[in-house]
C-alpha cells in the first residue's frame, strides 16, 4: 500500500508543477513497462494493483498504456492495453473496465520471457507518448533493470527524453548482488546516466521506507 500512496503523491506533485508552467497541454500520459523475464512474472500481481490505482487517478483526455518487456520490446505488439479516456464518465468507465479485463487476462496467461529488451521498451514508450502529445509524460519501469538481449540486437541508442519523467519501480536485487553489490549499484547508475543524458528525469522507488523523500528530493 505504501507504493500505491507514493504513486498518488507523484501524480499530485506533477499536477502542482504543471500549474506553474506556461499554457500547453495539461493532460497526462503514462506508459507502464512490465518485466516478464524469469521469476519476475511473480511480481505482476503487485503491478496489477498499480494499474488499478492509475485507472482511478487518471482523468478525461489522459492516456494510459501497459506493455510487456520481452525479447524485442520496440514494437506495438508488446502493448497489453492502451486507451485515452473519454470525456463522458459512462464511456470512461467502460474503457477502465475493458482495461482491467485485459490486464487480468494478461497476468493469468503471461509466460516468462527469456530476454529483457528494456531499452526497446523505453523507446517504444517515448514514441507512444510523443504521438499522444500529452502535457506530462511518465514512463514507469517495473523491472529489476537487468537487460539481456539476444544476439544481433543493437540497443546502444541515445534516448531522447526531454520532458519525460522516468520512474523505476521494484528494482529487485539479483542473487549475484550478494557476491558483488557493485553490480546492483552500477545497474542503477547506468540507467540514470542514460536517461539524464537523454534529457529526462530519473528516480527509483524501491526502498519503501524512504519513498517520500526520494520523490520530494
Model-based region annotation:
Residues 2-9:
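Sec-dependent signal peptide recognition
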Residues 15-18:
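C-terminal motif of bacterial Sec signal peptides marking the signal peptidase cleavage site
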Residues 20-22:
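Bacterial signal peptide processing site
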Residues 26-136, 138-140, 172-174, 208-212:
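Von Willebrand factor
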Residues 28, 112-163:
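Exposed acidic/Ser/Thr-rich ligand/metal-binding surfaces
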Residues 146-190:
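VWA/integrin I-like adhesion module and closely mimicked acidic/polar interface patches used
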Residues 181-217:
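Von Willebrand factor A/integrin I-like adhesion domains
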Amino acid at each position: 500500500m505504501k507504493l500505491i500512496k507514493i504513486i498518488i503523491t507523484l501524480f499530485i506533485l506533477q499536477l502542482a508543477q504543471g500549474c506553474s508552467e506556461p499554457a500547453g497541454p495539461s493532460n497526462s500520459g503514462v506508459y507502464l513497462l512490465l518485466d516478464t523475464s524469469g521469476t519476475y512474472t511473480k511480481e505482476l500481481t503487485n503491478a496489477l494493483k498499480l494499474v488499478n490505482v492509475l485507472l482511478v487517478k487518471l482523468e478525461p483526455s489522459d492516456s494510459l498504456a501497459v506493455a510487456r518487456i520481452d525479447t524485442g520490446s520496440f514494437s506495438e505488439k508488446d502493448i497489453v492495453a492502451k486507451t485515452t479516456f473519454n470525456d463522458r464518465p459512462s464511456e470512461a468507465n467502460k474503457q477502465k473496465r475493458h482495461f482491467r479485463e485485459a490486464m487480468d487476462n494478461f497476468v493469468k496467461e503471461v509466460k516468462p520471457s527469456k530476454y529483457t529488451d528494456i531499452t526497446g521498451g523505453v523507446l517504444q514508450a517515448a514514441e507512444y507518448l510523443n504521438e499522444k502529445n500529452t502535457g506530462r509524460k511518465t514512463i514507469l519501469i517495473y523491472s529489476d533493470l537487468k537487460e539481456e538481449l539476444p544476439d544481433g540486437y543493437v540497443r546502444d541508442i541515445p534516448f531522447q527524453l526531454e520532458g519525460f519523467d522516468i520512474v523505476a519501480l521494484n528494482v529487485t536485487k539479483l542473487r549475484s548482488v550478494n557476491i558483488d553489490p557493485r553490480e546492483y549499484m552500477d545497474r542503477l547508475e547506468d540507467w540514470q546516466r542514460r536517461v539524464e543524458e537523454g534529457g529526462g528525469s530519473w528516480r527509483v522507488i524501491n526502498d519503501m521506507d524512504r519513498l517520500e523523500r526520494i520523490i520530494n528530493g
